[in-house]
Amino acid sequence: MVRSGSFSVDSSATHQRTPSRTVTLGHIQPQAPTYRTVYCNDRESNQPVRFKGNSISTTKYNVFTFLPKGLFEQFRRIANIYFLGISCLSMTPISPVSPITNVAPLSMVLLVSLIKEAFEDWKRFQNDMSINNSTVEILQDQQWVSIPWRKLQVGDIVKIKKDGFFPADILFMSSTNSDGICYVETANLDGETNLKIRKALERTWDYLVPEKAYEFKGEIQCEQPNNSLYTFTGNLVVQKQTLPLSPDQLLLRGCSLRNTEYIVGAVVFTGHETKVMMNAMNAPSKRSTLEKKLDKLIITIFCVLVTMCLIGAIGCSIVTDREDKYLGLHNSDWEYRNGLMIGFFTFFTLVTLFSSIIPISLYVSIEMIKFIQSTQFINRDLNMYHAETNTPASARTSNLNEELGQVEYIFSDKTGTLTRNLMEFFKCSIGGVSYGCGVTEIEKGIAQRHGLKVQEEQRSTGAIREKGFNFDDPRLMRGAWRNEPNPDLCKELFRCLAICHTVLPEGDESPEKIVYQAASPDEAALVTAAKNFGFFFYRRTPTMVYVRESHVEKMGKIQDVAYEILNVLEFNSTRKRQSVVCRFPDGRLVLYCKGADNVIFERLANGMDDVRKVTREHLEHFGSSGLRTLCLAYKDLNPETYDSWNEKFIQAKSALRDREKKLDEVAELIEKDLILIGSTAIEDKLQEGVPTCIETLSRAGIKIWVLTGDKMETAINIAYACNLINNEMKQFVISSETDAIREAEERGDQVEIARVIKEEVKRELKKSLEEAQHSLHTVAGPKLSLVIDGKCLMYALDPSLRVMLLSLSLNCTSVVCCRVSPLQKAQVTSLVRKGAQKITLSIGDGANDVSMIQAAHVGIGISGMEGMQAVMASDFAIAQFRFLTDLLLVHGRWSYLRICKVVMYFFYKNLTFTLTQFWFTFRTGFSGQRFYDDWFQSLFNVVFTALPVIVLGLFEKDVSASLSKRYPELYREGIRNSFFKWRVVAVWATSAVYQSLVCYLFVTTSSFGAVNSSGKVFGLWDVSTMVFTCLVIAVNVRILLMSNSITRWHYITVGGSILAWLVFAFVYCGIMTPHDRNENVYFVIYVLMSTFYFYFTLLLVPIVSLLGDFIFQGVERWFFPYDYQIVQEIHRHESDASKADQLEVENELTPQEARSYAISQLPRELSKHTGFAFDSPGYESFFASQLGIYAPQKAWDVARRASMRSRPKVPKK
């Protein structure tokens, strides 16, 4: 049913039934919000609408589409299309080579890829069957009947038991809990393991037993299926009564029921229309910069191929015209007088002959190398293993390994990324009086920078210290607040902390044993503070909050008070505040509000200027101490005003369109004329090793930007504490807290405020840019840093100022953006990525960092305290910020070096091989006669030179891991792209030309007139086999010359490849076929090996061909060394004991930590219980495959993760 023009639902319209519009998986249709009508417990009424079934399919193929669709996927690669065209050409009469030469390698590559696709899809199919055949109880004829998930339909009444998974998106109707609530774990959706509370409408509480549930005939008018996990708008119509629905009543597929015996609900969305399946869209596809440059190299090679073919075509036309009498071509039926036709056909003949210049095995080899790098090196590096949380590093994609070695800009969140996200209530301000005596880590760092010695803290007698509470001030403890100048405000602050939140208490209702389940550590810290101040929040129902208050009426008296929660105005990134309207037992109505200081100050009542001024000073002091601040306010409401407002609130809450916007507008009507209570200050300490890590990364040439939602003072001091900013730097500060902007805000004209801020931002940007450019042109000028707040950033990102902002930022070593929204984080990242064309990396730990992580070239997720959304959206996951040192300076740099060398080696060996064919065409009048046997040409890439390059890509190390971190400046070579420049390509191309000339000319010239042991002159196949043997030896030994770190695997693969060629030659040349009678390949190797000339050539030619490379490397090392070569020389005489290990981490862990790590790496069956690795003991990740490699998030991955169910612990009776 679609109605686009109204916000409310007319109950008379609920009997109309029109087909519901649906949305296919992964494609959210851009359409105006509409709604659907679902008839509960009435399949016949729902049947005409034809809602989607609950069966899901996450496979990519079926029996009929596998081959065509699989081949289509493979031929999306331009290289495969190229080889397909070459294979087709080789089947025509103009081809000088057998089709097997090109068809066999292409078929091998395609077969391996298709087998991989088939295996992965088969696993998905098996998983789909397991999920679709899971059972759920539905209501049929007044009793619960068990059916498979796939048979579930929209409108069915279902019963979900404790620890069971929701099979569809369900409207929560009733619960075994007397207060109509249930507890839900959403780990499969967002990784958060803290329980969420869901509330059924009181009108549906009675529909719990099958007899009562059978009587339920409600109608659900709700939004169309969409991918928003955290929103839901709709109405429930029961007996002509319309009740608004919210996300509190929706139980999403994939979540599990906890701490509740069972619940009853009505199915709203099924199958691919559930919210989690609608979210199952592919993550942004990322390709490394080096891979994009590889495409350009391939195009260049193709141009070289075309050039060679054009030379051959032109040469053939000329030679044929001059030599046609001798060749007798004028008597032929073919019209060879037409030079254009001769050139045309010769061109395509030579294309098939020279096709091997583009390596078919390049992409397969690189994928294999990257895969092993990820699974065996990054995932198993104990230097990046966090023993405290049993969390190893994990590469969720292997596509971007080498990108880690070229990062120039890092964009970092602060909370939970640079800091621990372990919040502790530290200080507060009440009624203009500051409380709290502690010294923060930031203050200690400031003192040390000024040469002051900080004494150890002397805590007061009886000071309380527990998780979330590190407050020391006897004036507020144990009822002493009653003697303060503002005891009433103290009482209001404590009540605000105890009431205005969404925290869920668990466990015994005693202060020592209770556990608070909070959406964020801040919330938990504030409620814990209220408890220690004597206002103990111990129980919650959908409509009540219970607080045990001490010392309120008189000293020492304890009383339990029940506060009725009438309305909750929820926090979001736009409002930046949260409010509750509550009724005291005596009937008093109060609005409590907490939020960002600038938001609260804008809504204060008149006459509070003095308190506001003092509180602002306290906030600035708290911020300069590195504390996170929050302001609190309240307002008494009279019943008439509240009733009038509540009607508007209910209307907004019942709206089906723009509900969030309408609720925000209604909230503005009551969140004004507030009385300021004070502020709180929470300490979030730096993570271990952050300052050292940042200093190391800065030495590596990486510029670090901090993007945070904290106030400017807090952000600046955190930046100081972690060595991002120091006193030697010149700071540019662009803030909205200027006199001109404040005056404009006081006048209240929004248009004028916008104009003034934009002008101020433009003026500051211009002024700062001029100073920055002048400073950069000054000899030994100071390093620069920029600090800008979110309000100014909004205008600085305007197209008219964006270029100026970018220019200033790129001149700065460090940038701090404070008070920024998630959108602004992504905008800043995109600005540098696209505007500066620099390699960017974003790192964060929360849902608000996802857009920033996806906007960067490389996204890093911190598996921290804020769920796993950041990890889910990331390319790599680590547990601590300090692990970036190893990830970038060791693995990133090595991967970049290795992939560069692999690509260059492939380019070199294929060009060398093809050029020998090209030189041979000059001897054959450009006729297209092939130089090598078809099988020689087919197996050159895939067998005889395949393994050594893979070993190079896995084990190449210029310096050890410890030296990589000791000399972070080495990383700059990756930033400069030193190993993949066109100059490097030219050097390798020159080497290929030289070696091909040596191998071809030496053998062909020296064999002229030479005879074998039978007295016969060497023929074509004798010479070509000799050249081929020299090539195989030379290009394989070249691997040893270019390797900085040679292992036994290098010798095994190089020797094995040469041996493989000789064994193949012995077997192949010993087989007589009808084809061989014409080609004369039969017995060639045996004839050659019977001559001294063969052994002399094999010894001399490879040495001469490699001599040029040897001399060049020596000259380069002595006169034009790379940075890593200088480091090698410095440490050349040191012990090589540490070089045996890939990573020097063998003795880093205690036996217990090593055991935990080993357990975390064991292959295991994928869990069906929860969704993410290491989020709590006994839980494992649906993302973690048994090999430990993480693919980019695909539709089927999300579907599989969110649709799992737990195995029953005991057999069902």
From Swiss-Prot:
Region annotation (Disordered) ranges: 1-23
Residues that span the membrane, as ranges: 68-89, 94-116, 298-319, 347-364, 901-920, 935-954, 985-1006, 1014-1036, 1043-1063, 1077-1087
Pfam families (UniProt xref): Cation_ATPase, E1-E2_ATPase, PhoLip_ATPase_C, PhoLip_ATPase_N
Residues bound to Mg(2+): D845, D849
Gene: ALA3
Domain of life of the organism encoding this protein: Eukaryota
Assembly description: Associates with ALIS1 to form a stable and active complex. Interacts with ALIS3 and ALIS5 in a heterologous system.
Catalysis performed (reactions): ATP + H2O + phospholipidSide 1 = ADP + phosphate + phospholipidSide 2
Name the UniProt record assigns to this protein: Phospholipid-transporting ATPase 3
